[in-house]
Amino acid sequence: MPATAGRVRMPANNRVHSSAALQTHGIWQSAIGYDPYAPTSKEEPKTTQQKTEDPENSYASFQGLLALARITGSNNDEARGSCKKCGRVGHLTFQCRNFLSTKEDKEKDPGAIEAAVLSGLEKIRRGVGKGEVEEVSSEEEEESESSDSDVDSEMERIIAERFGKKKGGSSVKKTSSVRKKKKRVSDESDSDSDSGDRKRRRRSMKKRSSHKRRSLSESEDEEEGRSKRRKERRGRKRDEDDSDESEDEDDRRVKRKSRKEKRRRRSRRNHSDDSDSESSEDDRRQKRRNKVAASSDSEANVSGDDVSRVGRGSSKRSEKKSRKRHHRKERE
């Protein structure tokens, strides 16, 4: 079983969808009133017509239809987006190289236009076996290699020649001379317009290049100025930072010196205080010792005098007192 079984359905009409742009039936019918899908009479055999027609003759009839459509024109005056010089679509106005325009065709006599239309229709209806149609087909094959504008001009010339043969060669000569004059004028105008356009383009290019150079030079100057300002700011910041660092180091050194001096002063004071306290203690000790010695001497003298009076008890007491005093001195 395929992977898409039961999901994809075939369309009812298995044909490629054609857009409305390809359906030109309405365009032909509104432009020249020609209906290619109109029903034909049952009396005329279709098979004989199809066998007699050749591809070259069908192409010639198609070109004739195009020429008729351009000569008669549609209800609208100008096609949408058409060239302003020649009135055709497919190029812009400054790109136009067509020597003939639809405006020139409108300036023709209405009788000549009607005669050209009738002759073209007769050529299409009569058939294909004539030599004139073969000449037209050969000329149109050569013209198919060139642009569409050349094809249109040649078809108009052929129609005008046929119409002129019927009514006279004077009208053909007049129309040909008028067309030549118009071609020359159009060529001169085209050359002038081309030269003017080229000069304008050169001027605009020069202006743009000069403007670009100026803008580039200005931008370079601005960048240089900005870089200089940045360098100056950086140098100032560095100088300020160096000065701040030097000031901080000086302050630190001063603080260190002051701390050292304070410590020295404190140590000196403590040393002096210690020495003073030690000397005072030594003096006190000496005074005590002197007092004790003096008291012991006085007691010894008193005890020697009173030996006779006092018995063994007094001597013992004096010994105890002397021992106590010695103990006190040793403790101190």
From Swiss-Prot:
<feature type="compositionally biased region" description="Basic and acidic residues">
    <location>
        <begin position="124"/>
        <end position="133"/>
    </location>
</feature>
<keyword id="KW-0539">Nucleus</keyword>
<feature type="region of interest" description="Disordered">
    <location>
        <begin position="33"/>
        <end position="59"/>
    </location>
</feature>
<feature type="compositionally biased region" description="Basic and acidic residues">
    <location>
        <begin position="41"/>
        <end position="54"/>
    </location>
</feature>
<feature type="compositionally biased region" description="Acidic residues">
    <location>
        <begin position="241"/>
        <end position="250"/>
    </location>
</feature>
<feature type="compositionally biased region" description="Basic residues">
    <location>
        <begin position="198"/>
        <end position="214"/>
    </location>
</feature>
<dbReference type="GO" id="GO:0005634">
    <property type="term" value="C:nucleus"/>
</dbReference>
<feature type="region of interest" description="Disordered">
    <location>
        <begin position="124"/>
        <end position="332"/>
    </location>
</feature>
<protein>
    <recommendedName>
        <fullName>CAX-interacting protein 4</fullName>
    </recommendedName>
</protein>
<feature type="compositionally biased region" description="Basic residues">
    <location>
        <begin position="314"/>
        <end position="332"/>
    </location>
</feature>
<dbReference type="InterPro" id="IPR001878">
    <property type="entry name" value="Znf_CCHC"/>
</dbReference>
<dbReference type="Pfam" id="PF13917">
    <property type="entry name" value="zf-CCHC_3"/>
</dbReference>
<feature type="compositionally biased region" description="Acidic residues">
    <location>
        <begin position="134"/>
        <end position="153"/>
    </location>
</feature>
<comment type="subunit">
    <text>Interacts with CAX1.</text>
</comment>
<feature type="compositionally biased region" description="Basic residues">
    <location>
        <begin position="227"/>
        <end position="236"/>
    </location>
</feature>
<comment type="function">
    <text>May regulate CAX1 cation transporter.</text>
</comment>
<keyword id="KW-0862">Zinc</keyword>
<feature type="compositionally biased region" description="Basic residues">
    <location>
        <begin position="254"/>
        <end position="269"/>
    </location>
</feature>
<keyword id="KW-0863">Zinc-finger</keyword>
<dbReference type="GO" id="GO:0005737">
    <property type="term" value="C:cytoplasm"/>
</dbReference>
<keyword id="KW-0479">Metal-binding</keyword>
<feature type="compositionally biased region" description="Basic and acidic residues">
    <location>
        <begin position="154"/>
        <end position="163"/>
    </location>
</feature>
<dbReference type="GO" id="GO:0003676">
    <property type="term" value="F:nucleic acid binding"/>
</dbReference>
<feature type="zinc finger region" description="CCHC-type">
    <location>
        <begin position="81"/>
        <end position="98"/>
    </location>
</feature>
<dbReference type="GO" id="GO:0008270">
    <property type="term" value="F:zinc ion binding"/>
</dbReference>
